[in-house]
């Protein structure tokens, strides 16, 4: 039986995960810091997972939508960066937090920023990914070399990130 984290109307498989959003270190830090839902290690990859029930359509040229889309992109980038910094502050001992007993960290992980959008068309994922890639600060890309993925609920289920609706 898998550990589950319920976020944005989806049930995420949370084996080998640190629920950073629910952690004491995050709760005690106060305003001004945003975080992803959780960090999951799967196949020596640190996945910083952000979940959304919906997201502005990247193909809608309406000015109001463009503003909402850019604002959403900015917030997601901020969450990825803040979460990476908060996680590393725990890793090097600046911030104190106790990881779950089953949270085992690889010695040489790679890094993925993963955005899962529940109600999102397949063809909308790529433009969101491209925009996130473009908006991540250059120094983050140079230092950490993260891969960015944007997937919907169907793809997340196929890739083993969420419990399939058929399995519920």
Where are the language model's segments positioned?
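Catalytic cores of nucleic-acid endonucleases
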Residues: 54-114, 138-143
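Basic, amphipathic N-terminal segments that precede the first structured/catalytic domain
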Residues: 1-36, 165-168
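Structural motif
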Residues: 45-47, 112
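Short, flexible loop/turn motifs enriched in small residues
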Residues: 32-33, 41-44
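Conserved catalytic cores of phosphodiester-cleaving nucleases, focusing on short active-site segments
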Residues: 38-40, 47-53
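Polybasic (Lys/Arg-rich)
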Residues: 122-168
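Short acidic, S/G/P-rich loop/turn micro-motifs used as interaction or catalytic elements
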Residues: 54-57, 119-125
